[in-house]
Amino acid sequence: MFPFQPMYPMQPMPYRNPFAAPRRPWFPRTDPFLAMQVQELTRSMANLTFKQRRDAPPEGPSAKKPKKEASQKQKGGGQGKKKKNQGKKKAKTGPPNPKAQNGNKKKTNKKPGKRQRMVMKLESDKTFPIMLEGKINGYACVVGGKLFRPMHVEGKIDNDVLAALKTKKASKYDLEYADVPQNMRADTFKYTHEKPQGYYSWHHGAVQYENGRFTVPKGVGAKGDSGRPILDNQGRVVAIVLGGVNEGSRTALSVVMWNEKGVTVKYTPENCEQWSLVTTMCLLANVTFPCAQPPICYDRKPAETLAMLSVNVDNPGYDELLEAAVKCPGRKRRSTEELFKEYKLTRPYMARCIRCAVGSCHSPIAIEAVKSDGHDGYVRLQTSSQYGLDSSGNLKGRTMRYDMHGTIKEIPLHQVSLHTSRPCHIVDGHGYFLLARCPAGDSITMEFKKDSVTHSCSVPYEVKFNPVGRELYTHPPEHGVEQACQVYAHDAQNRGAYVEMHLPGSEVDSSLVSLSGSSVTVTPPVGTSALVECECGGTKISETINKTKQFSQCTKKEQCRAYRLQNDKWVYNSDKLPKAAGATLKGKLHVPFLLADGKCTVPLAPEPMITFGFRSVSLKLHPKNPTYLTTRQLADEPHYTHELISEPAVRNFTVTEKGWEFVWGNHPPKRFWAQETAPGNPHGLPHEVITHYYHRYPMSTILGLSICAAIATVSVAASTWLFCRSRVACLTPYRLTPNARIPFCLAVLCCARTARAETTWESLDHLWNNNQQMFWIQLLIPLAALIVVTRLLRCVCCVVPFLVMAGAAAGAYEHATTMPSQAGISYNTIVNRAGYAPLPISITPTKIKLIPTVNLEYVTCHYKTGMDSPAIKCCGSQECTPTYRPDEQCKVFTGVYPFMWGGAYCFCDTENTQVSKAYVMKSDDCLADHAEAYKAHTASVQAFLNITVGEHSIVTTVYVNGETPVNFNGVKLTAGPLSTAWTPFDRKIVQYAGEIYNYDFPEYGAGQPGAFGDIQSRTVSSSDLYANTNLVLQRPKAGAIHVPYTQAPSGFEQWKKDKAPSLKFTAPFGCEIYTNPIRAENCAVGSIPLAFDIPDALFTRVSETPTLSAAECTLNECVYSSDFGGIATVKYSASKSGKCAVHVPSGTATLKEAAVELTEQGSATIHFSTANIHPEFRLQICTSYVTCKGDCHPPKDHIVTHPQYHAQTFTAAVSKTAWTWLTSLLGGSAVIIIIGLVLATIVAMYVLTNQKHN
């Protein structure tokens, strides 16, 4: 690589110590007799350890050569070169290895890896082959005292004891099982349901487990491996292999495994095949044969081989037959040739190109199709020329071959140019397909120059870069983050997509016709046949020739037509080529360069500058590319927004206590929560109180201030009016009678008239004499009151103590509580039992999964329009055959094709007919790019809980259904059912690109053109395709072979453009949406009932725990509505040291600690959260209670990045200071009113008394 040798630094000189080395320490020598005894004991133990039954050694040379052979080799080392050569010859002519003669045994890997060695060692006594006709058809393994064998594997277990067992069938899991004898249970595998993502081991090496799927590299594992176990690092079975399916570069395995309950679960990927050695049979001339062993092959009988492939084109073993037919027995091929062997069955062709250098032409490089659906900027072209093969059909890399008027020529690929708006970079070619990377443009042109002639072809196609993610970038960035995407694979591995082939039709070749003297001579190419049709002097000639022949009846070249016939090569089923007459033999070959899942580097927009305000967030955005901004509220109504930001902008949003989330470009989501904070001081002066509450409760504050102002105004007005009224009343008598004067004391004494009420006896006597019904009613009122009071006393004195005692007694065994269904919020409580210390219980849900039951309705993707080569009949009529393909259309057109390239095609002008057929099929990339339509039903809930009961902790998974218990340390826990049946998924959902959408898709079989579901299939690989694309055939243009049509655009593509943000960004309650399986996690909605059954052993006697004799609680610091923003200090005196549970029975405060350590005398610090401005709660420490109360201040931070885990219940939202100022205000108004009323009363008494006196 470099022109010069690298220079390495010289080794440093060894360090020399100038001082003499110290003497070696002396140790006493051991007794030789004792050493001999130790060696003998070691030798005996080694014999006992290794003298066990061992399997037959693997094939191949041993790890170490025998000493004898090594010594012979050393002796022969000094011999001459001649003897060495003789020794080699003798070795070649020596007796054959008996193991090498046994062709039935599979050659094992000479150097198996560590995983393979471990599995082979564990499989030796626990896995047994199933033999069928002397071959291993599969395997049976013994797991957990049971024998498991795949039900689809036929044969007999190679063990007499196990073969005699009577098995039971479980068709749902494709397994047969039986209990093994007691003496064999010691050698069985153990199984486990624990399957963390990572790598596991099986017979062929490593198995990757990710997203609930087991995968291996492609080519690892094949038929005959059904029944093999997959093991973890501890040698436990995690799954049993049943089959597999190739998915690009990896193979997905069909397995049977176990869930957390120990219940068997089967996972089968789509289009999976069973891995037993059941032979797939194919057909040839009414004779069946194994598809992998055809009686003929292409190199020996090409025409017959194509006919055989056509007969079995729909056979499940077509791929095996195709591979075996191309690879003749006895011929070895290089591994690189495997990629190109299929397309040796085909040849290039010439086809019509709509835009050549000068108008339309029949081009050797006609472009059939262009696809650019990946996210990597690559383009896949399908052309009439071929790549990777030379003109003879042999392998030749970086070469293009093409058809030039019947002659196949080749050209180096670097002489072929491809460009859009600028030149493209050609990556590779395979068969009819070419992979290139092109810049953006509205058309794509391919051209090459040969013998000073330039051949080109252009087609209109908008080539553009398809970005992945939430930023619309135009070029892949140098730095960023990796994101899942779809890219075109740069290899030609078989991926399940096919391109249809058929025998080529007859093509007129004027070069075959020549004039020799006065007669016409037709010369067919060597090894091919030609059909000759002539009209000479009223004589019609039609015959097939394979060698040169003269036709003396004809004297002009225009009187004869020569058609090239070829039945040993296929061509692409193009609408630009005529169809062969009669029954056309068709086939299919694999499409290379398909879309595959990959990782793409996507850019990251600059982080927004965030400014926090009171319950608000301001984002200042500076995108480099158009970037999506999506927000939602983490409440029951998400109120999501979705906006594409192209220019610098500022966006303001409201944040509530329930949370708010925003996603900027390809950055991860960020969440913020508002705190109950506000300016001002709830415990300060009136203006500070008003400012504080105005920001917290603006409407309530305005309403309260308005009421207070109205009361004050009314009070002042009423007092003023009463004062004026009293003044007028006082002055009026004096104005009328100036000399009248009444003493004030007399007026006061005379104003109070005397009155005497009746006694109780007199009232009852009056009722008895005048109204006896009312008498009895009055008499029964005290009796009824006495009965009510008696019942209340009975309830208070009897029922409540009974319930308390019963609850205490039941707490010894059962305890029921309810916790919020919100991940991360810890729930603390205690169990009080008479005679025992309180038992603390702490529960923290780490994850809550909501998994709906889904049913796949259908799969939809891009469609591809298939067009049969037009069937042409000269001078005659045709009819359409019955249609059976999806959305198939057929029409017959007359008066077409009077001419074709190379001379006239038909002798007639208007009597010619063409049958055009077009239909719809799934695109080649449907396997990678498709959407799945599901119907969702009832959801199950799983909660991952971190539970602490006393001093025992466990992390467990609980099914929240109210039925499934979980046992740990003797504690039995039952959770559920959830308090609400809410789910973020609608009845109809769509899964696409790893995201879920609520979408009301059409039912199966009811798709509309141009809408989602225009093509529908039950699965990606199934053949039950429904299509409705408004396909209409148009009349072909005279003189050109093609099938024009019109069609609605892809509904799948339109849905991808118009779809709203997925549930990942719009789900209520902050749900996190995932796939595989479809589920919602950590939805903060509802509550989970919990029921504990606690054994007596976990309780502690009261005598063994401390008892507080004196306790005092002080709030050192208190910030309300903040995450454990309160600090309480409890000073105490205890009977002894120990550990005590702490708890607040009311919902006023939530404690962070579940228990505290106590000494005989000291203080304990406890952190708590509260939403109360003036918290006052009883704190229970062991069996004692202490009251804590004080004032709390609002938090300083308006916005925080974590939810508040404080208590949501509180008793007072208004501070005592505010109430004091309010009562003072109302109290002052009341004093004014009272003074006015007193004055008015005095005046009224005075006036009335004066009038009476007068």
From Swiss-Prot:
Enzyme class: hydrolase
UniProt effect for mutating V526D: In strain: Isolate TC-83
Regions of this protein lying in the Extracellular compartment: 276-701, 758-772, 817-1224
One GO term of the biological process aspect: symbiont-mediated suppression of host toll-like receptor signaling pathway
Modified residues (Phosphoserine): S124
EC number: 3.4.21.90
Bilayer-crossing regions: 702-722, 773-793, 796-816, 1225-1245
Region (Functions as an uncleaved signal peptide for the precursor of protein E3/E2), start-end ranges: 276-287
SUPFAM superfamilies (UniProt xref): E set domains (SSF81296), Trypsin-like serine proteases (SSF50494), Viral glycoprotein, central and dimerisation domains (SSF56983)
UniProt cross-references to InterPro entries, sorted A to Z: Alpha_E1_glycop, Alpha_E2_glycop, Alpha_E3_glycop, Alphavir_E2_A, Alphavir_E2_B, Alphavir_E2_C, Flavivir/Alphavir_Ig-like_sf, Glycoprot_cen/dimer_sf
Region entry Ribosome-binding, spans: 112-126
Chain positions found as Phosphothreonine: T93, T108, T127
Site positions per UniProt: Involved in dimerization of the capsid protein: Y200, N233
Region annotation E1 fusion peptide loop: where it falls in the sequence: 896-913
Outcome of substituting K65A: Complete loss of capsid protein nuclear localization
Necessary for nucleocapsid assembly and virus assembly, as annotated region: 1-33
Catalysed reactions listed for this entry: Autocatalytic release of the core protein from the N-terminus of the togavirus structural polyprotein by hydrolysis of a -Trp-|-Ser- bond
Record key words, sorted: Capsid protein, Clathrin-mediated endocytosis of virus by host, Cleavage on pair of basic residues, Disulfide bond, Eukaryotic host gene expression shutoff by virus, Eukaryotic host transcription shutoff by virus, Fusion of virus membrane with host endosomal membrane, Fusion of virus membrane with host membrane, Glycoprotein, Host cell membrane, Host cytoplasm, Host gene expression shutoff by virus, Host membrane, Host mRNA suppression by virus, Host nucleus, Host-virus interaction, Hydrolase, Inhibition of host mRNA nuclear export by virus, Lipoprotein, Membrane, Palmitate, Phosphoprotein, Protease, RNA-binding, Serine protease, T=4 icosahedral capsid protein, Transmembrane, Transmembrane helix, Viral attachment to host cell, Viral attachment to host entry receptor, Viral envelope protein, Viral penetration into host cytoplasm, Virion, Virus endocytosis by host, Virus entry into host cell
One cellular-component annotation, GO: membrane
Active site (record annotation): H152 (charge relay system), D174 (charge relay system), S226 (charge relay system)
Disulfide bonding pattern of the chain: C861-C926, C874-C906, C875-C908, C880-C890, C1071-C1083, C1113-C1188, C1118-C1192, C1140-C1182
Region of interest (Host transcription inhibition), residue spans: 33-68
Notes concerning its domains: Structural polyprotein: As soon as the capsid protein has been autocleaved, an internal uncleaved signal peptide directs the remaining polyprotein to the endoplasmic reticulum.
Other notes: Structural polyprotein: Translated from a subgenomic RNA synthesized during togavirus replication.
Descriptive protein name: Structural polyprotein
Organism phylogeny: Viruses, Riboviria, Orthornavirae, Kitrinoviricota, Alsuviricetes
